[in-house]
Amino acid sequence: MIFIVLGTQKFQLNRLLKLIDDYISRDIIREKVFAQIGNSTYEPENYQYVRFMSKEEFDATVKKSDLLITHSGVGSIITALKADKAVVVYPRLKKYKEHVDDHQLDIARAFEKKNYLVCCYENDELSDKLELARKTTFNKYVSQRENVVELILGYIENEQIEK
C-alpha cells in the first residue's frame, strides 16, 4: 500500500493528489493508495482518503504501508524512516503557492543527501522516483537526539570524574 501524508498545516498540495488520481486511472499505480490530505481542497476520486488522523491511526497506517509519499514534514518523514519504510518526499513549493517559502525543499534535500529517502520535485519525475524508492537500499535512520544525549551524558560523567 502507498500511504500519502500531507500533514495538518493550512497549506494544500492538490498537485500531488491530482497526479496520483491520474496515475491510478492510467494504471501507472496499481496498488492500493490511502491518503491523509489535510487541508487540500482537491478530493481524490480513485483512492480513499481522510483529512486528518489520530496519532494511533497514523502509526497503524504507516505500519501497514510499503511506501510513503509525503510532504516534507519532519515528523512524517522521521516516523516513516523509523518504521523502515521507503519514502518519497514531494515538498510543497513556493512557486506553486503551496507554502510561503521553500524550507520543505531544504528539508527534503538534507534527508536525501544522507540517503534516507528519494525526493520528487516535479510531476514528471514521480513515476521514476516511486520505482527508485522501491529499488534503493537506504541508509538506516539514526536519530541525532540520541547522539546529543550521549554527548551530554559523557560530558557530565567526565566532569564528575575530574572533581
Where are these regions (language model features)?
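Nucleotide-activated sugar donor-binding and catalytic core shared by glycosyltransferases
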Residues: M1-K163
